[in-house]
From Swiss-Prot:
InterPro entries per record: FluC
Subcellular location field: Cell inner membrane
GO CC aspect terms: plasma membrane
A UniProt-annotated Pfam family: CRCB
Function field: Fluoride-specific ion channel. Important for reducing fluoride concentration in the cell, thus reducing its toxicity.
Family, per entry: Belongs to the fluoride channel Fluc/FEX (TC 1.A.43) family.
Activation/inhibition comment: Na(+) is not transported, but it plays an essential structural role and its presence is essential for fluoride channel function.
UniProt gene name: fluC
Cysteines paired by S-S bonds: none
Bilayer topology annotation: Multi-pass membrane protein
Name used for this protein in its record: Fluoride-specific ion channel FluC
Catalyzed chemical reaction(s): fluoride(in) = fluoride(out)
Length: 124
């Protein structure tokens, strides 16, 4: 039951952060490309790499994993929004933007998980 509370707490923080980052990115760059979703997915992937690597090299409590890994990062990142925004770009005829969105999200997110892990592993 305690872990559920940690997931809920982290999730509420992550959801609010995602919302705020999306608003900021729209204000900075407009809404013609889903930069907000890309940003939260890339940042979330980086921190997920850190959380995973910390769990490999030291003891990370189940509560911290629930709070940060499942809750905060789970709510911060969003595959469903990425998928919906990509489909909307396609439906609007922006095939190149949709392809760029897919390539950037997938490649940058995988790279950022790796980078986060390497940051931790290089310090052990």
């Amino acid at each position: 039951m305690t872990n559920l509370l940690f997931v809920a707490l982290g999730g509420s923080i992550g959801a609010v952060l995602r919302y705020l980052m999306s608003i900021i990115m729209i204000q900075l760059f407009g809404s013609s490309f889903p930069f907000g979703t890309l940003l939260v997915n890339v940042l979330g992937s980086f921190f997920m790499g850190i959380v995973y690597a910390l769990g490999q090299v030291s003891h990370v409590s189940p509560e911290l994993k629930a709070l940060v890994g499942v809750g905060l990062l789970g709510a911060l990142t969003t595959f469903s929004t990425f998928s919906n925004e990509t489909l909307l770009l396609m439906q609007q005829g922006y095939w190149f933007k949709s392809l760029i969105n897919v390539l950037l999200n997938v490649s940058l997110c995988i790279f950022m998980v790796y980078l986060g892990q390497q940051l931790v592993f290089s310090r052990v």
